[in-house]
């Protein structure tokens, strides 16, 4: 499974349980009805209803950074100094 870290936990819909800086595992990845890349996260609530009464399922992928990509950038940066 893909590992990601939350980089934006502001303005979550009602029932959202993301915490900025915490690592999560992605159970499922898909494109929703609004053509947004969406992640279903293991171990937290992934559905609910917004203040306007619209149902939501999964979290927008823009709220996360891929841990594998972050590790590669750090390694390349350290290599440049040596």
Regions found by a protein language model. Name each.
Residues 54-58, 66-82:
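Compositionally biased, intrinsically disordered linkers/stalks adjacent to structured regions
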């Amino acid at each position: 499974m893909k590992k990601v870290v939350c980089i934006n936990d502001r303005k979550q819909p009602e029932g959202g349980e993301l915490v900025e800086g915490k690592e999560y595992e992605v159970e499922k990845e898909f494109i929703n009805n609004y053509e947004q890349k969406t992640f279903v996260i293991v171990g937290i609530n992934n559905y609910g209803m917004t203040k306007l009464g619209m149902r939501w399922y999964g979290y927008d992928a823009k709220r996360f950074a891929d841990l594998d990509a972050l590790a590669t950038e750090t390694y390349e940066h350290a290599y440049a100094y040596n």
